[in-house]
Amino acid sequence: MAPKKKGKSEGLTAASPQPAKATPNWPAFTPLVPKSDLALEEVLQGQIVTIPNFWTATLCKNYVSFLSSLPLTTTPGKPKKGDAVRVNDRFQIDDPVFAERLWSQTALKSLVTEAQRKELWGGEVVGLNPNIRIYRYSKGQFFDQHYDDSNNVTLPGAPPTLARTTWTLLLYLTSPATGCIGGETVFYPYSPRKKSKDPTPEPFVVDLEAGLALLHRHGADCMLHEGREVTDGEKWVIRSDLCVKR
């Protein structure tokens, strides 16, 4: 894995959102594609997994309409030292109920918890990070090259479950079909043989598809990646993380 000289994303603040916000009245997850019609696709071995059509176009459209009503905050123009440059609008809330709904009321839980995938995720997956983040990228906005950190979290329950995040979950709600141009997520493979004469590996590009769920490994083994500039329309994303027992 590449030495981490580029900026990081959210660090420990990702696990500690301010608790004062009122919990949104999230819309129901309807309509959904039947679980039997969905599958995990490991598009880059050990690093990137996608679930095409995880959400329907109608559900994505309903959520974009709802999320537009939330009090989004524009990120600072100058990031903290060591953080990557990011220009977007965001909403962040600690909402264990929504995280559990997204985990268990969709196909995500059944797809992710298949026994043979435990090694892939870095442990026994027990749910999603209750730290829910909503991102909107308008024309000219982007997220520069960075790595996503792993965080320790506590999932509510009796007793609570001590967990850590191992994979980022990004759920795309818009795409070129909805008028969003640009905004692709780009991953940069790293060749450990610095003196090798082999050409630098080509970047791995994940195009926007409304309803696509993208999972990518983070923490110590995170690939350098970025969100390209949006050149037209709006890019909407719901962000959480897979949590494994610690």
Short names for language-model regions:
Residues 1-213, 221-246:
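Fe(II)/2-oxoglutarate oxygenase catalytic core
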